[in-house]
Amino acid sequence: MSFCSFFGGEVFQNHFEPGVYVCAKCGYELFSSRSKYAHSSPWPAFTETIHEDSVAKCPEKNRPEALKVSCGKCGNGLGHEFLNDGPKRGQSRFUIFSSSLKFIPKGKEAPASQGD
């Protein structure tokens, strides 16, 4: 069952360059390219966040396996975390809207970045 409507334009679905994905609204580091993997859904998929507080999580009503995720800094809606649905047993799958992300290529991060 799909949780989100797909309208196309998922520019980061098949994007696998080294770097860091940050919140498109505030620039907070969210995901490293090292945690990104190919998945059959139309949205970019990640296994983990860069920082423990990169995302805030809210239970999805009537769906215990899904959490709505938003930027841990500004609250921008990002997508969902699907528990135990990652590429390896016990891993989560973060299914994130490309429009909520901005990509920073490796070597172009801010000096304090811990991303990649």
Swiss-Prot record:
<feature type="binding site">
    <location>
        <position position="26"/>
    </location>
    <ligand>
        <name>Zn(2+)</name>
    </ligand>
</feature>
<keyword id="KW-0712">Selenocysteine</keyword>
<feature type="binding site">
    <location>
        <position position="71"/>
    </location>
    <ligand>
        <name>Zn(2+)</name>
    </ligand>
</feature>
<dbReference type="GO" id="GO:0005737">
    <property type="term" value="C:cytoplasm"/>
</dbReference>
<dbReference type="GO" id="GO:0005634">
    <property type="term" value="C:nucleus"/>
</dbReference>
<dbReference type="GO" id="GO:0030091">
    <property type="term" value="P:protein repair"/>
</dbReference>
<dbReference type="GO" id="GO:0033743">
    <property type="term" value="F:peptide-methionine (R)-S-oxide reductase activity"/>
</dbReference>
<comment type="function">
    <text>Methionine-sulfoxide reductase that specifically reduces methionine (R)-sulfoxide back to methionine. While in many cases, methionine oxidation is the result of random oxidation following oxidative stress, methionine oxidation is also a post-translational modification that takes place on specific residue. Acts as a regulator of actin assembly by reducing methionine (R)-sulfoxide mediated by MICALs (MICAL1, MICAL2 or MICAL3) on actin, thereby promoting filament repolymerization. Plays a role in innate immunity by reducing oxidized actin, leading to actin repolymerization in macrophages.</text>
</comment>
<feature type="binding site">
    <location>
        <position position="23"/>
    </location>
    <ligand>
        <name>Zn(2+)</name>
    </ligand>
</feature>
<dbReference type="GO" id="GO:0030041">
    <property type="term" value="P:actin filament polymerization"/>
</dbReference>
<keyword id="KW-0539">Nucleus</keyword>
<keyword id="KW-0399">Innate immunity</keyword>
<dbReference type="InterPro" id="IPR052150">
    <property type="entry name" value="MsrB_Met_sulfoxide_reductase"/>
</dbReference>
<keyword id="KW-0391">Immunity</keyword>
<dbReference type="InterPro" id="IPR002579">
    <property type="entry name" value="Met_Sox_Rdtase_MsrB_dom"/>
</dbReference>
<dbReference type="Pfam" id="PF01641">
    <property type="entry name" value="SelR"/>
</dbReference>
<keyword id="KW-0963">Cytoplasm</keyword>
<keyword id="KW-0206">Cytoskeleton</keyword>
<feature type="domain" description="MsrB">
    <location>
        <begin position="1"/>
        <end position="106"/>
    </location>
</feature>
<dbReference type="GO" id="GO:0045087">
    <property type="term" value="P:innate immune response"/>
</dbReference>
<dbReference type="InterPro" id="IPR011057">
    <property type="entry name" value="Mss4-like_sf"/>
</dbReference>
<keyword id="KW-0479">Metal-binding</keyword>
<keyword id="KW-0862">Zinc</keyword>
<comment type="similarity">
    <text>Belongs to the MsrB Met sulfoxide reductase family.</text>
</comment>
<protein>
    <recommendedName>
        <fullName>Methionine-R-sulfoxide reductase B1</fullName>
        <ecNumber>1.8.4.12</ecNumber>
        <ecNumber>1.8.4.14</ecNumber>
    </recommendedName>
</protein>
<dbReference type="GO" id="GO:0008270">
    <property type="term" value="F:zinc ion binding"/>
</dbReference>
<feature type="binding site">
    <location>
        <position position="74"/>
    </location>
    <ligand>
        <name>Zn(2+)</name>
    </ligand>
</feature>
<dbReference type="GO" id="GO:0015629">
    <property type="term" value="C:actin cytoskeleton"/>
</dbReference>
<keyword id="KW-0832">Ubl conjugation</keyword>
<feature type="active site" description="Nucleophile">
    <location>
        <position position="95"/>
    </location>
</feature>
<keyword id="KW-0560">Oxidoreductase</keyword>
<dbReference type="GO" id="GO:0003779">
    <property type="term" value="F:actin binding"/>
</dbReference>
<dbReference type="GO" id="GO:0033745">
    <property type="term" value="F:L-methionine-(R)-S-oxide reductase activity"/>
</dbReference>
